[in-house]
């Protein structure tokens, strides 16, 4: 068995990635989220495949086909809710994974980090298009509002929006192409995941101390396979509790009303995992400015290696920057809350203040804190 594992051209790739991979001996549970994201991707592809067997991407039958899946298909309700809530679990793991990378300075592995940002954009695009497919009120109006943002692009904006819509409004052509892209993107994401892993295994994993761990490595299997398995059990337990007891708690009631272009919902808002970015978008009075700020709210992650001023890699031994980091986390929670609120006083001003704080903490306060800590520790 050992000979096959180490000599077979295909199996040895798996061996080097998941079995004999040298891993730091001190990585904590915060390093479990990579494998959990892999699990989420597998769950989404499998449940999505079975949903696609029964779904019809036509405006007249899309809503009915989702109802048919839930009512008439064997365990269709389970597959549908696992897919919908699996997306939420996916984003919870994504945010924690990115947060871990920010805390422990993993962004210094630039290729891995940049590939991660591309993956984040791809997953967000996939989730957005998936939300349109049930063709409920929030699906239709969410698609209309978000795609319409592209009209803010000077000169080509309007033409671009109509090209994406396949007409003069969100209609049959839009739904069909969104279904096509929603189906193909997870497979592209899978390919990008392998590139992400390829870059990671070039440098090796980071660890909580931020120090070089070459002198103290252990094999990935059995130590981290069993550790990952515990994470898998916790994730699946959480997902099944959500699916079986509270399947609609993260959804929007408006999406149980079929799409109607003549009736606008009182509050148009995306799924909860986009609310922080939506709040940043809404806090800018100018349309183009809002769109640019929205993109920058994610793209700013690519600047983190340039904004790193500390002589230490992670925040483990840096209390001032730690404080800044947790204020940033609180700020993101405030933005998520604001994104779900109506556009009126006092939510507008709170959203604007939280948006300014978000960029200020990342661009100004965290780099400053790093320099202050260097001086305190006399590391200059």
Curated annotation (Swiss-Prot):
What positions does the entry give for heme b b566 binding? 97, 196
Q: Which residues bind a ubiquinone?
A: 201
Q: Where does heme b b562 bind?
A: 83, 182
Q: Which cofactor does it need?
A: heme b
Transmembrane residue ranges:
33-53, 77-98, 113-133, 178-198, 226-246, 288-308, 320-340, 347-367
User: What membrane topology term does the record carry?
Assistant: Multi-pass membrane protein
> GO biological process: what's one of them?
mitochondrial electron transport, ubiquinol to cytochrome c
- Molecular function as annotated in GO: metal ion binding; ubiquinol-cytochrome-c reductase activity
Q: Enumerate the subcellular locations listed in this protein's record, separating them with semicolons.
A: Mitochondrion inner membrane
Q: Which UniProt keywords apply?
A: Electron transport, Heme, Iron, Membrane, Metal-binding, Mitochondrion, Mitochondrion inner membrane, Respiratory chain, Transmembrane, Transmembrane helix, Transport, Ubiquinone
Q: Which GO terms describe its cellular component?
A: mitochondrial inner membrane; respiratory chain complex III
Q: Which Gene3D superfamilies match?
A: Cytochrome Bc1 Complex, Chain C
Q: How is the cofactor bound?
A: Binds 2 heme b groups non-covalently.
Family, per the entry? Belongs to the cytochrome b family.
Q: How does it assemble?
A: The cytochrome bc1 complex contains 11 subunits: 3 respiratory subunits (MT-CYB, CYC1 and UQCRFS1), 2 core proteins (UQCRC1 and UQCRC2) and 6 low-molecular weight proteins (UQCRH/QCR6, UQCRB/QCR7, UQCRQ/QCR8, UQCR10/QCR9, UQCR11/QCR10 and a cleavage product of UQCRFS1). This cytochrome bc1 complex then forms a dimer.
Q: What does this protein do?
A: Component of the ubiquinol-cytochrome c reductase complex (complex III or cytochrome b-c1 complex) that is part of the mitochondrial respiratory chain. The b-c1 complex mediates electron transfer from ubiquinol to cytochrome c. Contributes to the generation of a proton gradient across the mitochondrial membrane that is then used for ATP synthesis.
What else does the entry mention about this protein? Heme 1 (or BL or b562) is low-potential and absorbs at about 562 nm, and heme 2 (or BH or b566) is high-potential and absorbs at about 566 nm.
This protein's name = Cytochrome b
Q: Please tell me the species this chain comes from.
A: Clethrionomys rutilus (Northern red-backed vole)
The gene designation is MT-CYB
